[in-house]
């Protein structure tokens, strides 16, 4: 969401690229035409299979920021990811707001039987900037209310982290992912599958500039490179009721 959270942007006829509104939309239509004529014919068998059913490998909960493309980051094909996006990659605790995110989680777990749920934050997150400095949200009451689900992360950083100048945003971004993982575990469908060893959860932070992903490891309480040496960082709690 970039600077929209720190300064009220005045919309005009041109976009950040210097295009008019008509030119911006024409770019999207041209892209669709290329998809129809160049991409779809080569993937027609895949789309024919997907037209009948979906069986995604994972659920991917991430920010609405236009710079984050889950399928690109993970090199996934259509049908591989069940993606849910919102401002700040928020997962409301169960019962507080049983809306789009909560229903998507329940459907992914109970109907699609996903075996992995990834909560992915990212660098330069406008939502996290707004959590640190909410003054720019006065004209966006809905966003302000939504970001209250990030308050636990802000409070944790404020009371426990002696961050140097410029470090608070990165630390908050990581702590927000951990907080949303905690919220995720309050959902009955998730809690039951975790306890039975049928579901794994993952917390990632993606760096837009470098393409690096840091993953949360619950045992150490730290984030480590996803493609680093050694075992993969694991955010999943130990199962208590392993299926026979």
Indicate residue ranges for each PLM-predicted region.
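Gly/Ser/Thr-rich loops at beta-strand to alpha-helix junctions
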Residues: 65-67, 122-127
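Short beta-strand segments
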Residues: 61-63, 85, 118-122, 202-207
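Structural motif
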Residues: 57-60, 80-82, 115-118
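Divalent-metal-activated hydrolytic enzyme cores
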Residues: 2-56, 89-115, 126-244
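Catalytic core of membrane glycerolipid acyltransferases/transacylases, capturing the structured
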Residues: 67-87
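N-terminal active-site beta-alpha-beta segment that forms phosphate/nucleotide-binding
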Residues: 50, 54, 61-71
């Amino acid at each position: 969401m970039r600077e929209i959270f720190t300064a009220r942007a005045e919309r005009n006829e041109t976009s950040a690229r210097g295009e008019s509104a008509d030119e911006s939309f024409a770019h999207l239509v041209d892209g669709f035409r290329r998809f129809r004529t160049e991409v779809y014919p080569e993937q027609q068998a895949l789309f024919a299979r997907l037209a009948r059913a979906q069986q995604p490998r994972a659920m991917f909960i991430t920010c609405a920021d236009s710079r984050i493309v889950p399928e690109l980051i993970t090199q996934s094909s259509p049908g591989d990811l069940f993606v849910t996006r919102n401002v700040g990659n928020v997962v409301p605790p169960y019962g507080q707001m049983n809306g789009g995110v909560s229903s998507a989680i329940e459907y992914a777990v109970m109907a699609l039987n996903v075996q992995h749920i990834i909560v992915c934050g990212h660098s330069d997150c406008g939502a996290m900037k707004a959590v640190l400095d909410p003054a720019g949200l006065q004209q966006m009451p809905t966003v302000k209310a939504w970001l209250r689900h990030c308050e636990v992360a802000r409070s944790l950083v404020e009371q426990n982290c002696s961050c140097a100048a410029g470090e608070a945003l990165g630390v908050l971004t990581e702590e927000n992912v951990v907080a949303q993982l905690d919220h995720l575990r309050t959902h009955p469908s998730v809690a039951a599958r975790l306890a039975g060893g049928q579901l794994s959860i993952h917390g990632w932070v993606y760096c837009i500039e470098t393409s690096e992903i840091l993953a949360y490891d619950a045992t150490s309480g730290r984030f480590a490179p996803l493609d680093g040496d050694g075992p993969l960082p694991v955010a999943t709690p130990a199962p208590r009721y392993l299926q026979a």
